[in-house]
C-alpha cells in the first residue's frame, strides 16, 4: 500500500561556509541492496540524451513501497550545474567524525548551508591546538529493523557557546587543508557573522546514513555549465505524485560540483527538486536498472537478503595515520551522554575510507560517549538481497553525511508500465527542445514486459524548459561512485559579512629597520679595568739552543745474529802416500756428531784437535790427514766469521766490530760490509782503532782551486757548487769502482749502526771570505754546507744546524791563498755526509776557491 509521506525535517544549522576544492576520488564500493528513501540530491548537470530503446513488453505493476521513516537533513552540497532530474540514490552511512581542522584564514563569505539536525548539548571547550587526524573508526553493524514507529521528537536546542573577544579582521590567510567531515554539532545560537574564509577542500565521502523523510525543497540554483555526457540509465516506474514543497530561499551560487558516476536507477522516490526538462524520447516502457559503465544487459533483480549478523566490535586504535580498513565491529551499547571534551589538536586529513553497504535502520539508542577514532573497517562483500522487513521505528537523527556527487543524467521515459529489456535500438537523432510539460498523472501499472537489450546511446537533446515538479519515485539503489569531476568554477564573491569579533592577538612583528644614528653622547667616565684578554698567539720560534752534551753510553745491545758460515779454505797439500795396508773389516762410517762441536772451544775440548792417528781404533786410515786439514780449515773460517778480520774476503760490519775482536790492531784501511749479505759490495774504509770510528773516503776528495763563478751583479748571495756552478757536482763517497747506488745503501746501513757522525771540510780561498769577515766583524758572508738529508748547515743560528771552525785563514782579501777548516758533528747521523757547499764571497775575476773534502766518520 502507498505509505503516508513523512513530516518535514527541521531546519538544520548553518552549513560550513567554505566551499572546498573537489576531493580525490574514493575507491569504488560494491553496490548494496536498495536502501530507504534518501534526501533528494542537488540537481545534476544536464546529460546528453540516451539512445531510445525499443518498446518493451509491459511489466507487472510493483507494489507501492512503504513510506520511509524520517531522516535528518544533510549538509548542503556544492551547487552543481542544473541538469535533468537524476535518479535517487540511497542515503550513505554516516562517516566517522573527523578531528577539528586548523582555523582557516579568512575567506570570502560562503553560501548559507541547510539546517542540520539538532545534536546533543556539549560543553563549550577551549580552543585546542591543531593535532594529527585520527584514522576512521570501524562502523558498527546496523541493528535489526523494528516496526514502524511514530516520528521522533525534535532534539533539544544546544546551549549557546561563549562569544569570544572581538578582534580586528585579519588578512586573508592561505588556504588550509580540508579535514575529514566532522560530526554534527549542536545547533548553537546565531553567532556574529564570521570572517570570510578561503574555500576548503571537501572531505572524503562518509558511509551512507539511514534514509530520512523529505526535507524542504531547496532553492532553484542558477544555471550551471553543461556537465559531461553521462551514460543513460534505464527509466524506473512512475510513482505517485507528491505535493510540491514550498519555495526555499535562493542561496549564493556555490562552486561547480564534481560530476559523479551514474548509479543504477532505483524505484521512483518522492519528488526531488525540479530539474531541467530533458529532451523528449520515444515512448518506451522503462527498462530495468542497468549497471554503470558500458551498456549491457541487466540481470534480474535479486531477492533482498536478511540483514547479516553484526560483526564484533573493534578495539579503538591509537590516533595515528590512517591505516588499512579494519573489520566491522559490533555496535556498542549506548552510554549516557558525556560532556564534550576540549577540542583536540588539528590532525592530518585521514585517507578516504571505503564506502560500506547501507545497513538497516536500528532503534534509537542512548547517545554514547565519544569514543576514540578507530581504524577504518574493511569493505564488506555485498550481501544477497533479503526479504523486505517490517518498517522500523523512527531512529535517532543520524550524522549528516557529506553531499553526494551529482549522478549522471538518465533517459527520460514515458509514463508507462515497467517492461522487460527490449532489443537494442538504433541511435536516435538529437531531439528538439520540448515545451514545459504539465505534471503527468500516475500511469496504471502495466503487465511485465520482456527485458530488452540496452539501446544505443542517442544524441544529446536540446535543453527543455523548466518542467513542474514530477511525481516522487521510490528510492533507487545507490549508484557507484563516479569518477572525479573537474573542479567547478569559483563562485561569485558573497556579500560582505558584518564586522567580525575581535581576533586573537597577532604574532610579534618582524624586527624593524634600524633607525638613524642618534647624536653622539657625552664622554662617559672611565670604566673599571677590564678582565685580562685572551692569551695571545705563540710567538715566533726562537733560535735553537746549542747542542746538548753527549749522553751516557747506552747499555750493550743484545748479541747479533749468528754469522754466515765461512767459505771453504784452500785444500792442504796432499800427504805422502802410505803403504797399502791389509783390507780391513767393513767400516761403520764417520760419526758426524764430531762436527757438532766445531769452534765451541769454550764448551769443551775439540775432539778433532786432540785426536791422533795412534789413538784411532784401527778405523782411521792414512787419508785422515786430509780430513784433519779440512776440519782445521773449516774451524778457521768459523773463527774468522765470529771474529772478522776486515779483509775483502772476510769484511767486518763496522770498524767498531774489528776493534772489539782485535783491540791490538792498528789504525788503517779495512773492508766493511754494513748491510751484510754478499761480500762483493764491501767498501774500503779507514778504521781509527783509537776511537773505533769508521771513516768513508769521498770520491773525489777535492775540488780544484780556480775561479769557478763570475757574476756582474753587486748583490752577493750564496751560490751552491753542485746545483748552480757550471761543472759542479755533489760529493759522493765509497769506492770509485762501486756503483753510487751500492755505496749509498752501505752508507744508509752504516748510519743506522752508528750514534754520532763528524766530518771536516777545508775551504781554500783567494780573495774570498769563508767564515768571519774581518772588515765588518760578522758572519754574513760565511759559506753554507748541505747535509745528505738536504738540511742546510750554517755558521750561526740554531746550534743544532751550525758548524764550527777549527782554523779561519780566509777573513780578508789579500791576493794570496788561505784556508778555513770547517768541522760539523751531530748525533743526527742522517745529516752526514756533506754533499754540497755554497760560498757567498765569489763572483769577481780575482776570486778563486777550492775545497778538500775530508772523510765522514761514524762512531
From Swiss-Prot:
This is Collagen alpha-1(II) chain. GO terms for cellular component: collagen type II trimer; extracellular matrix; extracellular region. Residues 491-586 are annotated as: Triple-helical region. The C-terminal propeptide, also known as COLFI domain, have crucial roles in tissue growth and repair by controlling both the intracellular assembly of procollagen molecules and the extracellular assembly of collagen fibrils. It binds a calcium ion which is essential for its function. The lineage of its organism: Eukaryota, Metazoa, Chordata, Craniata, Vertebrata. Ca(2+) binds at residues 673, 675-676, 678, 681. It comes from the Eukaryota. Residues 78-121, 204-220, 249-277, 306-321, 520-529 have a biased composition (Low complexity). InterPro entries: Collagen, Collagen_superfamily, Fib_collagen_C. Residues 614-859 form a propeptide. Residues 625-859 form the Fibrillar collagen NC1 domain.
Amino acid at each position: 500500500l502507498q505509505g503516508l509521506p513523512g513530516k518535514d525535517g527541521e531546519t538544520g544549522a548553518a552549513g560550513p561556509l567554505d566551499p572546498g576544492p573537489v576531493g580525490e576520488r574514493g575507491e569504488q564500493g560494491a553496490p548494496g541492496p536498495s536502501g530507504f528513501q534518501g534526501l533528494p540530491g542537488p540537481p545534476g548537470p544536464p546529460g546528453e540524451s540516451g539512445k531510445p530503446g525499443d518498446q518493451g513488453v509491459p511489466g507487472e505493476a510493483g507494489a507501492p513501497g512503504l513510506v520511509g521513516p524520517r531522516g535528518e537533513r544533510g549538509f548542503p552540497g556544492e551547487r552543481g550545474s542544473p541538469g535533468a532530474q537524476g535518479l535517487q540514490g540511497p542515503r550513505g552511512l554516516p562517516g566517522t567524525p573527523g578531528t577539528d581542522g586548523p582555523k582557516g584564514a579568512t575567506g570570502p563569505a560562503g553560501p548559507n548551508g541547510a539546517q542540520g539536525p539538532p545534536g546533543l548539548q556539549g560543553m563549550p571547550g577551549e580552543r585546542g591546538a591543531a593535532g594529527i587526524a585520527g584514522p576512521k573508526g570501524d562502523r558498527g553493524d546496523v541493528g535489526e529493523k523494528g516496526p514502524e514507529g511514530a516520528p521522533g521528537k525534535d532534539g533539544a536546542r544546544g546551549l549557546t557557546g561563549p562569544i569570544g573577544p572581538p578582534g580586528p579582521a585579519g588578512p586573508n590567510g592561505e588556504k588550509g587543508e580540508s579535514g575529514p567531515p566532522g560530526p554534527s554539532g549542536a545547533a548553537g545560537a546565531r553567532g556574529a557573522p564570521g570572517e570570510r574564509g578561503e574555500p576548503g577542500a571537501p572531505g572524503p565521502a562518509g558511509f551512507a546514513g539511514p534514509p530520512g523523510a523529505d526535507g524542504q525543497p531547496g532553492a532553484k540554483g542558477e544555471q550551471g555549465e553543461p556537465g559531461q555526457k553521462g551514460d543513460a540509465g534505464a527509466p524506473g516506474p512512475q510513482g505517485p505524485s507528491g505535493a510540491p514543497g514550498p519555495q526555499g530561499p535562493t542561496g549564493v551560487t556555490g562552486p561547480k560540483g564534481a560530476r559523479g558516476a551514474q548509479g543504477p536507477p532505483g524505484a521512483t522516490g518522492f519528488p526531488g527538486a525540479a530539474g531541467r526538462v530533458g529532451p523528449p524520447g520515444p515512448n518506451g516502457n522503462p527498462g530495468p536498472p542497468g549497471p554503470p559503465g558500458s551498456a549491457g544487459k541487466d540481470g534480474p533483480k535479486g531477492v533482498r537478503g536478511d540483514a547479516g549478523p553484526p560483526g564484533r566490535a573493534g578495539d579503538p586504535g591509537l590516533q595515528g595515520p590512517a591505516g588499512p580498513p579494519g573489520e566491522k565491529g559490533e555496535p556498542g551499547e549506548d552510554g549516557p551522554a558525556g560532556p564534550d571534551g576540549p577540542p583536540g589538536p588539528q590532525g592530518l586529513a585521514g585517507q578516504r575510507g571505503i564506502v560500506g553497504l547501507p545497513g538497516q535502520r536500528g532503534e534509537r539508542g542512548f547517545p554514547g560517549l565519544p569514543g576514540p577514532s578507530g581504524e577504518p573497517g574493511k569493505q564488506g562483500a555485498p550481501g544477497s538481497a533479503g526479504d523486505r522487513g517490517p518498517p522500523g521505528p523512527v531512529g535517532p537523527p543520524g550524522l549528516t553525511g557529506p553531499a553526494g556527487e551529482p549522478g549522471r543524467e538518465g533517459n527520460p521515459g514515458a509514463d508507462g508500465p515497467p517492461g522487460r529489456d527490449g532489443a537494442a535500438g538504433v541511435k536516435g537523432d538529437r531531439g528538439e527542445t520540448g515545451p514545459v510539460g504539465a505534471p503527468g498523472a500516475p500511469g496504471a501499472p502495466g503487465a511485465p514486459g520482456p527485458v530488452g537489450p540496452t539501446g544505443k546511446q542517442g544524441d544529446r537533446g536540446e535543453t527543455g524548459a523548466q518542467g513542474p515538479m514530477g511525481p516522487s519515485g521510490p528510492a533507487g539503489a545507490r549508484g557507484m561512485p563516479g569518477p572525479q569531476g573537474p573542479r567547478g568554477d569559483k563562485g561569485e564573491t558573497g556579500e560582505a559579512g558584518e564586522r567580525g569579533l575581535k581576533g586573537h592577538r597577532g604574532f610579534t612583528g618582524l624586527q624593524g629597520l634600524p633607525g638613524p644614528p642618534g647624536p653622539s653622547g657625552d664622554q662617559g667616565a672611565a670604566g673599571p679595568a677590564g678582565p685580562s684578554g685572551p692569551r695571545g698567539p705563540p710567538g715566533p720560534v726562537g733560535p735553537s739552543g746549542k747542542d746538548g752534551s753527549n749522553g751516557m753510553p747506552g747499555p750493550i745491545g743484545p748479541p747479533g745474529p749468528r754469522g754466515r758460515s765461512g767459505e771453504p779454505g784452500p785444500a792442504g797439500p796432499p800427504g805422502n802416500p802410505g803403504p797399502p795396508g791389509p783390507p780391513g773389516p767393513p767400516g761403520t762410517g764417520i760419526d758426524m756428531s764430531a762436527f757438532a762441536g766445531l769452534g765451541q772451544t769454550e764448551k769443551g775440548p775439540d775432539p778433532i784437535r786432540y785426536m791422533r792417528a795412534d789413538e784411532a781404533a784401527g778405523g782411521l786410515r792414512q787419508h785422515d790427514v786430509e780430513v784433519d786439514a779440512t776440519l782445521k780449515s773449516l774451524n778457521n773460517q768459523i773463527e774468522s766469521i765470529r771474529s772478522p778480520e776486515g779483509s775483502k774476503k772476510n769484511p767486518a760490519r763496522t770498524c767498531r766490530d774489528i776493534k772489539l775482536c782485535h783491540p791490538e790492531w792498528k789504525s788503517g784501511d779495512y773492508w766493511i760490509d754494513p748491510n751484510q749479505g754478499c761480500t762483493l759490495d764491501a767498501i774500503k774504509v779507514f778504521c781509527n782503532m783509537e776511537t773505533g770510528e769508521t771513516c768513508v773516503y769521498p770520491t773525489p776528495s777535492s775540488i780544484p782551486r780556480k775561479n769557478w763563478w763570475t757574476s756582474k751583479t753587486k748583490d752577493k748571495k750564496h751560490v751552491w757548487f753542485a746545483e748552480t756552478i757550471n761543472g759542479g757536482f755533489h760529493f759522493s763517497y765509497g769506492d770509485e769502482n762501486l756503483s753510487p747506488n751500492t755505496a749509498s745503501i752501505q752508507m744508509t746501513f752504516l748510519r743506522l749502526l752508528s750514534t754520532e757522525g763528524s766530518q771536516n771540510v777545508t775551504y781554500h780561498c783567494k780573495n774570498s771570505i769563508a767564515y768571519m769577515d774581518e772588515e765588518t766583524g760578522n758572519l754574513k758572508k760565511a759559506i753554507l754546507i748541505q747535509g745528505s738529508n738536504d738540511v742546510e748547515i750554517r755558521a750561526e743560528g740554531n746550534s743544532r744546524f751550525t758548524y764550527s771552525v777549527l782554523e779561519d785563514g780566509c777573513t780578508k782579501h789579500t791576493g794570496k791563498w788561505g784556508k778555513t777548516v770547517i768541522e760539523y758533528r751531530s748525533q743526527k747521523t742522517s745529516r752526514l755526509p756533506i754533499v754540497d757547499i755554497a760560498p757567498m764571497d765569489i763572483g769577481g775575476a780575482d776570486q778563486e776557491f777550492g775545497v778538500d773534502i775530508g772523510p765522514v766518520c761514524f762512531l
